[in-house]
Curated annotation (Swiss-Prot):
The modification Phosphotyrosine is found at residues 367, 397, 401. Residues 366-375 have a biased composition (Polar residues). PROSITE patterns: MARVEL, OCEL. The lineage of its organism: Eukaryota, Metazoa, Chordata, Craniata, Vertebrata. Interacts with TJP1/ZO1. Interacts with VAPA. Interacts with CLDN1, CLDN6, CLDN9, CLDN11, CLDN12 and CLDN17. Interacts with PLSCR1. Interacts with LSR, ILDR1 and ILDR2. Interacts with TJP2/ZO2. It comes from Mus musculus. This is Occludin. It is found in: Cell membrane; Cell junction, Tight junction.
Length: 521
């Protein structure tokens, strides 16, 4: 069943609003309205974002970060396996296992056992030549760091820790990913130079000797000679070494994607309210549709012992009607008391089907047992972070629809009596002056209301970044509570209602002028 309150209009979306431009006479206004058409001014507080961000899904930005961190873990393990499988050939160089086997007839310089004993000198004694063992060690070290960092990111995201749901956490992820990505890039380049000696031999003092030794493995004519396995693995890039190089670049790309999605997550957290972000999946729907017949029987049986609804029930029902303190709707008459007191089924429905409500109902204001609206406020901490409750209701937002169908019609009738259809250009000019004056007043009043709501939203986000024991938290909480009192005052509510009346008046005048312009020949 639909959970939208009865007679509730559809939600207003600023991006779907199409203004109804009217074309005034050029001889009267000089074409000014053609150049600057009057557009609706969407208010920050009256048009909240209705989009819900499901950050618990694997396809969401945090979910993609979890997937990428898991892939980095797998690629780091693969790099360990590939690089470790080639370390045995490097140990042979240092111990001189192949001795005179390198003393080929065409070498002419007696490389022999001297190469085996002086292999390490290439990397440290002469400079400009990368030791393969040092390059592999560097890549293994960076793979270990990436493995640990990715494991931490994955674990903190999967266990749904509170730290992983803050903007500061994703800022740390961005910084760590950038550092590790740069270091892995350097390690991969060094590894390429280390496992491919001919790539770094040009311009070095041992370039000609290395080319002479390794040339036999690059030409088909040398296949008949005795092939030393240690020298072969030194001169030729093994398949597992090539795989390690490719995995190194893939890790760099993965870290770049993590940075992108972490920045995207931070932007969404800054743009949307916390109540619009779902970090955990809400199981709010039953496995099977409810039995309607049993539900009706339970409701009918429960009406005997149900206490009568409180007198302020009209203020507690989540409907699009704004009730004033004197029981009127925006200065007009409201429904009679018998309308909502004669049927006790509405409170019973609220008690019987709490599990079939949609996600939007969990974002509605809560009510206490005595029927009063509970307005959350910031308070001094009692037991550290454990005593801090999650603010799930965006109480500093209101929707523009606060009048029911009957009250809107009555209000429209008043504007029709005050501003009847235009019959002459003089009357149109008078309407235009009233429209301009009302528009300026509406913008000024709307800006005043928006300042309060924007400040509430800013303080709400700042309080999550402060420790509850700090002085900054206490000062921000006091200011938050003060603004909540200002917003709950009668002066603020009267300004809000007057602002909505002004908007209705301006819309009516605009429609009258547009109708007159369309009727003109």
């Amino acid at each position: 069943m639909s959970v939208r309150p009865f007679e509730s209009p559809p939600p207003y979306r600023p991006d779907e609003f199409k203004p109804n431009h009217y074309a005034p006479s050029n001889d009267m206004y000089g074409g000014e309205m053609h150049v600057r058409p009057m557009l609706s001014q969407p208010a920050y507080s009256f048009y909240p974002e209705d989009e819900i961000l499901h950050f618990y899904k694997w396809t969401s930005p945090p979910g993609v970060i979890r997937i990428l961190s898991m892939l980095i873990i797998v690629m780091c393990i693969a790099i360990f396996a590939c690089v470790a499988s080639t370390l045995a050939w490097d140990r042979g160089y240092g111990t001189g296992l192949f001795g005179g086997s390198l003393n080929y007839p065409y070498s002419g310089f007696g490389y022999g056992g001297g190469y085996g004993g002086g292999y390490g000198g290439y990397g440290y004694g002469y400079g400009g030549y990368t030791d393969p063992r040092a390059a592999k060690g560097f890549l293994l070290a960076m793979a270990a760091f990436c493995f640990i960092a990715s494991l931490v990111i994955f674990v903190t995201s999967v266990i749904r820790s509170g730290m992983s749901r803050t903007r500061r956490y994703y800022l740390i992820v961005i910084i760590v990913s950038a550092i590790l990505g740069i270091m892995v890039f350097i390690a991969t380049i060094v590894y390429i130079m280390g496992v491919n000696p001919t790539a770094q031999a040009s311009g070095s003092m041992y370039g000609s000797q290395i080319y002479m030794i390794c040339n036999q493995f690059y030409t088909p004519g040398g296949t008949g000679l005795y092939v030393d396995q240690y020298l072969y693995h030194y001169c030729v890039v093994d398949p597992q070494e090539a795989i390690a190089i490719v995995l190194g670049f893939m890790i760099i790309v993965a870290f770049a994607l993590i940075i992108f999605f972490a920045v995207k997550t931070r932007r969404k957290m800054d743009r949307y309210d916390k109540s619009n972000i779902l970090w955990d999946k809400e199981h709010i729907y039953d496995e099977q549709p409810p039995n309607v017949e049993e539900w009706v029987k339970n409701v009918s049986a429960g009406t005997q012992d149900m206490p009568p609804p409180p007198s302020d029930y009209a203020e507690r029902v989540d409907s699009p009607m704004a009730y004033s303190s004197n029981g009127k709707v925006n200065g007009k008459r409201s429904y009679p008391e018998s309308f909502y007191k004669s049927t006790p089924l509405v409170p019973e429905v609220a008690q019987e089907i709490p599990l079939t409500l949609s996600v939007d109902d969990f974002r509605q204001p809560r009510y206490s047992s005595n029927g009063n609206l509970e307005t959350p406020s910031k308070r001094a901490p009692t037991k550290g972070k454990a005593g801090k409750g999650k603010r799930t209701d965006p109480d500093h937002y209101e929707t523009d629809y606060t009048t029911g169908g009957e009250s809107c019609e009555e209000l429209e009738e008043d504007w029709v009596r005050e501003y009847p259809p235009i019959t002459s250009d003089q009357q149109r000019q008078l309407y235009k002056r009233n429209f301009d004056a009302g528009l300026q007043e509406y913008k000024s009043l709307q800006a005043e209301l928006d300042d309060v709501n924007k400040e509430l939203s800013r303080l709400d986000k700042e309080l999550d970044d402060y420790r509850e024991e700090s002085e900054e938290y206490m000062a921000a909480a006091d200011e938050y509570n003060r603004l909540k009192q200002v917003k709950g005052s009668a002066d603020y509510k009267s300004k809000r209602n007057y602002c909505k009346q002004l908007k209705s008046k301006l819309s009516h005048i605009k429609r009258m002028v547009g109708d007159y312009d369309r009727r003109k020949p």
